[in-house]
Amino acid sequence: MSFSACQTCECCRRGHPAHCHSFDRINFESTGENSVFWEEGSTRSAEPDIFGQFFGQSSFASWTIVQEDAVVNVSGLVEGREELQLLAPLGCGIQTGAGAVLNAAGAQAEDTVVVLGLGGVGLSAVMGARIAGCKTIIGVARNEARLELAMALGATHVVRIDSADVRVVTEGVRAVTHGRGADVTLETTGVPELVAGGIRMTANKGRIVQLGTAPETAVLNLPIHEFMVAGKQYMGVVEGDVVPREFVPKMIEWVKAGRLPLHKIVGFYPAEDFEAAIRDMKSGRTIKPVLLW
């Protein structure tokens, strides 16, 4: 499962459903009239009416009600429950990171890619950059274990954040790139200071891709003239700007071919061990917990 979109707005019609004008309302709000199976006059206590609405991923349910377009039919691509449970996270964080590199940024083999933050989205971006054949892939994080995992997943270099001064990270990236900076910078943390640092460590004509969610009140200050002269591009990207029914099957093929080593970041937990899954995710022991019923 993945996200839903209205299918009628300009973004949807142009093949960008992740930027649907009604994305939040359709995926994260349940106001009755936008719920699946909702009928005028029905109530929560009315039987046998069942209705609901929520994003297809991360619903913590063995059964869930979703819009039809949130479902990706993998019949013929997936064999058995064991394979299906490994692939379960593809429809959100994995496609966000990998899709941002391969689809939104259009990274090429000659590009240098920097990934700020190495959670599920960031590590998926690292794997996506490796699939693209990017010559230099730099992972940036605080956690040493995450940096080691990034190297195992395809990063060519890592920079550890061991200071509150973001300039240290910028200098580290510029040292790896011989002063030039990155062609593609993927910011997955949403930390305003790192966002600003990401822009500085990006090369002229480079792309800065914002994937991490910042506080709603956060503001980014840009030196307008410098930004214009450098020809940099700053773009916000949701869900990798992909069409799930097209991109998820591609990811499945990459997993099977060993190009997207999903097993290195996914961990499985019985549903009754939900709290343990949360603890392991917060501690970094497991990157992508999957609940099993």
Q: How should each PLM-predicted stretch be described?
A:
Residues 1-71:
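Glycine-rich phosphate/adenylate-binding loop and adjacent beta-alpha elements
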Residues 202-204:
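Helix-to-beta-strand junctions that scaffold the AdoMet/dcAdoMet cofactor pocket
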Residues 111, 206-207, 232:
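Glycine-centered, small-residue-biased loops immediately flanking beta-strands
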Residues 196-200, 241-293:
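C-terminal hydrophobic helical "lid"/dimerization subdomain
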Residues 44-60, 78-103, 116-124:
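A glycine-rich, Thr/Ser-enriched phosphate-binding loop motif common to dinucleotide/cofactor-binding enzymes
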Residues 82-83, 106-112, 180:
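Short helix-loop-beta connector
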Residues 112-118, 130-197:
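Adenosine-nucleotide cofactor-binding segment
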Residues 213-231, 246-250:
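Rossmann-fold NAD(P)-binding glycine/threonine-rich loop
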